[in-house]
């Protein structure tokens, strides 16, 4: 009995993410068959996959592969590489301080940060709170797992688990709609300055609420407002009444 006729080695590949959770909602992940299931892995799956190799071998009268008598190996063709504009340090900083802000402000629906090169529009960092490890994408956070475990009905538990998994995989920064809000205060200030309507030292008073056409608009400062402030201070405070004025 020649044992070599019965033992062979099959090569396989598996995607590994050395940085664990870093940029996980951007990168996404692949399944057991290396097919992209989320993020850029899914979007560019055809470009990244390449062409699978194969082994062609003869069979004997019993239907057993004659791998060492006749065998032809067709090599796999590698897929394309995808190079991102993300900067690993910028990405790390985005994720670190986003997590701090989400905890301090007790955000329930996850936060997001996008850092761009203002000259080219290149994305340098894109972070979403409540991310995951793409090496084990089907593992929920401790908090979400506790939520699932608290459900007794198996059908409801399965549905909740699927909901929470899809939520942690979802890239909120590009998949959810978001009203720009305070982001446009920069443009409001720029237009007012350019047209000579205000200067950096123009003053505005914030008493928390400002009435326009009978409708009250509130400042995010719940301690009675920012009081009298310059345009520069109003920008720093992101004061709603000041920019309405």
What do these predicted regions represent?
Residues 23, 27, 37, 41, ...:
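Extracytoplasmic/secreted envelope proteins and their assembly/folding machinery
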Residues 81, 119-120, 165, 169-173, ...:
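Conserved catalytic neighborhood of penicillin-recognizing serine enzymes
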Residues 31, 49, 95, 99-103, ...:
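Sec-exported extracytoplasmic/periplasmic mature domains
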Residues 1-79:
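Small/polar-residue-rich segments within soluble enzyme cores
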Residues 66-78, 88, 92-180, 215:
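Short pre-catalytic segments that frame enzyme active sites
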Residues 26, 93-97, 121, 177-204, ...:
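Active-site SXXK
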Residues 8-12, 103-116, 200-203, 245:
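Surface-exposed patches in mature extracellular/periplasmic domains of secreted proteins
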Residues 34-38, 76, 84-92, 168, ...:
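Soluble non-cytosolic domains of exported or imported proteins
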């Amino acid at each position: 009995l020649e044992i070599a006729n019965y033992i062979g080695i099959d090569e396989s590949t598996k995607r590994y993410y050395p940085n664990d959770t870093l940029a996980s909602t951007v990168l996404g992940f692949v399944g057991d068959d290396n097919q992209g299931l989320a993020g850029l892995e899914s979007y560019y799956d055809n470009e990244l996959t390449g062409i699978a190799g194969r082994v062609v071998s003869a069979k004997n009268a019993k239907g057993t592969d004659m791998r060492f008598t006749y065998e032809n190996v067709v090599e796999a063709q590698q897929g394309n590489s995808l190079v991102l504009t993300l900067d690993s340090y910028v990405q790390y900083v985005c994720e670190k301080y986003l997590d701090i802000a989400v905890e301090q402000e007790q955000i329930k629906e996850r936060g997001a940060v996008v850092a761009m090169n203002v000259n080219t529009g290149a994305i340098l960092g894109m972070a979403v709170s409540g991310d995951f490890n793409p090496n084990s994408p089907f593992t929920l956070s401790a908090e979400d797992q506790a939520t699932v475990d608290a459900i007794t009905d198996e059908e409801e538990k399965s549905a909740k688990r699927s909901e929470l998994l899809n939520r942690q995989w979802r890239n909120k920064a590009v998949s959810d709609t978001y009203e720009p809000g305070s982001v446009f205060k920069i443009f409001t200030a720029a237009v007012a300055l350019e047209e000579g309507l205000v200067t950096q030292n123009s003053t505005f008073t914030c008493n928390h609420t400002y009435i326009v056409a009978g409708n009250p608009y509130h400042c995010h400062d719940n301690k009675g407002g920012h009081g009298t402030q310059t345009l520069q201070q109003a920008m720093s405070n992101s004061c709603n009444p000041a920019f309405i004025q």
